[in-house]
Swiss-Prot record:
Residues 19-73 are annotated as: 2 X 7 AA repeats of Q-H-G-H-G-G-Q. Homodimer. This is Antifungal protein. It comes from the Eukaryota. Keywords: Antimicrobial, Fungicide, Repeat, Signal. It comes from Sarcophaga peregrina (Flesh fly). This protein inhibits the growth of a variety of fungal species. The antifungal activity of this protein is enhanced by the presence of sarcotoxin IA. Residues 63-85 have a biased composition (Basic and acidic residues). The lineage of its organism: Eukaryota, Metazoa, Ecdysozoa, Arthropoda, Hexapoda. Sequence repeats lie at residues 19-25, 67-73. Residues 22-32 have a biased composition (Gly residues).
Length: 85
């Protein structure tokens, strides 16, 4: 029950600040805090040096990551990981 309450509070915070997140301005990805309300953040899309997309899934667990537009950074890292780097 406590965990549910915390999730609700975090969701409200995500709604309050998601509109002002840096996702849209972040060249590494487009994380949207508002979408964290629905239990997952927007997938971060990063491009590694080889020009391939890496899709970050970290927003699923951490709404604040997407709120601040960090989803794409995780995606970039995943892109390297997917290539074996």
């Amino acid at each position: 029950m406590v965990k549910l309450f915390v999730i609700v509070i975090l969701a409200l915070i995500a709604v309050a600040f998601g509109q002002h997140g840096h996702g849209g301005q972040d060249q590494h990805g487009y994380g949207h805090g508002q979408q964290a309300v629905y239990g997952k953040g927007h997938e971060g899309h990063g491009v590694n040096n080889l020009g391939q997309d890496g899709h970050g899934q970290h927003g699923y667990a951490h709404g604040h990551s997407d709120q601040h537009g960090h989803g794409g950074q995780h995606g970039q890292h995943d892109g390297y990981k997917n290539r074996g780097y």
